[in-house]
Amino acid sequence: MADIRWDALWTHVHLATLAADADGYGEIRDGAIAVRDGRIAWLGARADLPAGARAEREHDGGGAWLTPGLIDCHTHLVHAGNRSNEFEARLNGVPYEHIARAGGGILSTVRATRAASEDALAQASLPRLNALRAEGVTTVEIKSGYGLDLETERRMLRVARRFGQTLRVRVRTTFLGAHAVPPEFAGRADDYIGHLCADVLPALAAEGLVDAVDAFCETIGFSPAQTARMFDAAQALGLPVKLHAEQLSDQGGAALVARYGGLSADHLECLTDAGVAAMAEAGTVAVLLPGAFYCLRETRLPPLQALRQAGVPMAVSTDCNPGTSPLSSLLLAMNMACTLFRLTPLEALTGATRHAAAALGLAGTCGVLAPGCVADFALWRIDRPADLAYAMGLNPCAGVVKDGAPAR
């Protein structure tokens, strides 16, 4: 038999492949995984390693569990400013409406972000990203949406791109100009959407800063008609879409984004049966955001059983943002998804890997351990995969591999 040459080989590891055709976690006890050119070349039981196989670098996992690298598929982690004062005020009985009228809320983050330089934005945001990376996250989505003007949206997306180019993490950028109406367009939401579609999005897309387009479709955000205009502009530029949908009320957003073949609909506490059916038909991923549910002390759960029965993939993410989910731990988000939403640990881990990849248009690229996929994985000092969604306040991550090379 001809020699088989690999760049790297990990042995003495237990694999949780999370492959779609696997039973449960896709466990392979006492396994091995080989990498060539940044991709998985082989995996299986260590006893089944091909005869004559050789690797330039061999790593002994010491009995660790090895999973796909985690994927945080919905974050707003690039921003300036701090809103802990609002958190304190709300807990002291001040209504959010009073806070907003006094200049707080999302527009306070917009002011702080507009005032920050690109370097200052990067410096403020890096600790949030590094907290995720320390927990085995190898892919992260980062949205704009705290600039609401061309120059600040550009700065936010440039920071996100910089992180992807300079750190061992894959970054997918999402343009969220339709997040709120900025002060200069107060009372003129239609005009603002027109400005985004005609001026801002085309300019940012031309600079290669946008991987997808999102909007906040809600009574306090943008109407379905305004959202559809945003999606039309995105599709004209060849960009996929996703949506903040049905968080506070049923606006038909899930069915709308499904009609556009959207990657995901996110939040979904007020999702209807019609929305579930539309998502199932389109293959749109349901992104669950238990951090926002927790911080807002919501009581209405997304229709988890209906999503399960319809076969809608469910992803789990942090929704890291300064106002409603200041959460930089995907492991804690997984625990919240189990505790608050009653996901199983398997559903939570699959939601932070394979289904999160699909929510970013990366299905078949990452999120599973399979030959041909990028070699992004994490090693864990745990007894079984369910521990990742079980324990709180501990970080059992023993190592991270990005594109086949150790990343920490």
UniProtKB/Swiss-Prot annotation:
Its EC number is 3.5.2.7. Zn(2+) binds at H74, H76, H244, D319. It catalyses: 4-imidazolone-5-propanoate + H2O = N-formimidoyl-L-glutamate. It comes from the Bacteria. InterPro entries: Amidohydro-rel (IPR006680), HutI (IPR005920), Metal-dep_hydrolase_composite (IPR011059), Metal_Hydrolase (IPR032466). N-formimidoyl-L-glutamate binds at Y146, N321, G323. Coiled coil: none annotated. Keywords: Cytoplasm, Histidine metabolism, Hydrolase, Iron, Metal-binding, Zinc. Binds 1 zinc or iron ion per subunit. GO terms for biological process: L-histidine catabolic process to glutamate and formamide; L-histidine catabolic process to glutamate and formate. Its cofactor is Zn(2+); Fe(3+). GO terms for molecular function: imidazolonepropionase activity; iron ion binding; zinc ion binding. Pfam families: Amidohydro_1. 4-imidazolone-5-propanoate binds at R83, Y146, H179, Q247, T324. GO terms for cellular component: cytoplasm. Pathway: Amino-acid degradation; L-histidine degradation into L-glutamate; N-formimidoyl-L-glutamate from L-histidine: step 3/3. Fe(3+) binds at H74, H76, H244, D319. SUPFAM superfamilies: Composite domain of metallo-dependent hydrolases, Metallo-dependent hydrolases. Catalyzes the hydrolytic cleavage of the carbon-nitrogen bond in imidazolone-5-propanoate to yield N-formimidoyl-L-glutamate. It is the third step in the universal histidine degradation pathway. Belongs to the metallo-dependent hydrolases superfamily. HutI family. This is Imidazolonepropionase. The lineage of its organism: Bacteria, Pseudomonadati, Pseudomonadota, Betaproteobacteria, Burkholderiales. The gene is hutI.
